[in-house]
Regions:
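The feature captures the beta-strand-to-loop junction immediately N-terminal to the Walker
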Residues: 42-44
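Helix-to-loop junction immediately C-terminal to a conserved catalytic motif
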Residues: 57
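Conserved ABC transporter NBD signature motif
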Residues: 65-78
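Q-loop/switch helix immediately C-terminal to the Walker
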Residues: 101, 108-122
Length: 166
């Protein structure tokens, strides 16, 4: 039998709207995302995909509506009221976003291995050898040569940067 956390959405967006002056970025979006669920946002250019994803990730505060995160204890908290540090940890451990522009999702000034290891460190892994081995393993899984573990993302092609975000 699944526990209450698995039955509850991990992220709830209700009536999200973002206005840029008189221009509508997006309006009235509501959705729920459950643990283990993968969601893709598709649409025409200028339809509000990036605006929506930026609100869902906490990078952009909505003009109206809310984004609630349900933590492991079942407590719902406003994603936009969380500290930047907590939100960053959350996005590295429990929620994942593959950004249209990889520079929005990667730390370009540090190595690919460090980008991968950051999530593991947030989850409590501390041994350098374990972090490095995990980074090499993940690079192989997304079909990036593990010999490039020390290269910075800016040295990768756009497609490789997209895969590195995964």
């Amino acid at each position: 039998m699944a526990d209450a956390f698995e039955q509850s959405p991990v992220l709830c967006a209700t009536d999200l709207t973002k206005l840029y002056g008189t221009h509508v970025g997006c309006t009235g979006v509501s959705l729920e995302i459950y643990p283990g669920e993968v969601l893709g946002i598709v649409g025409e250019s200028g339809s509000g995909k990036s605006t929506l994803l930026n609100m869902l990730s906490g990078r952009l505060r909505p003009t109206a509506g809310s984004v609630l995160y349900c933590d492991a204890h079942g407590m719902k908290r406003s994603l936009h009221d969380l500290s930047e540090g907590y939100r960053r940890r959350l996005l590295r451990t429990e929620l994942g976003f593959v950004h249209q522009h990889p520079r929005d999702g990667l730390r370009m000034q540090v190595s690919a291995g460090a980008n991968i290891s950051e999530r593991l460190m947030a989850a409590g892994v501390r041994r350098y050898a374990d972090l490095r081995q995990s980074a090499v393993t993940w690079l192989k899984r997304v079909e990036i040569d593990p010999a490039r573990v020390d290269d910075r993302p800016e040295q990768y092609s756009g497609g490789m940067q997209q895969r590195l975000q995964i």
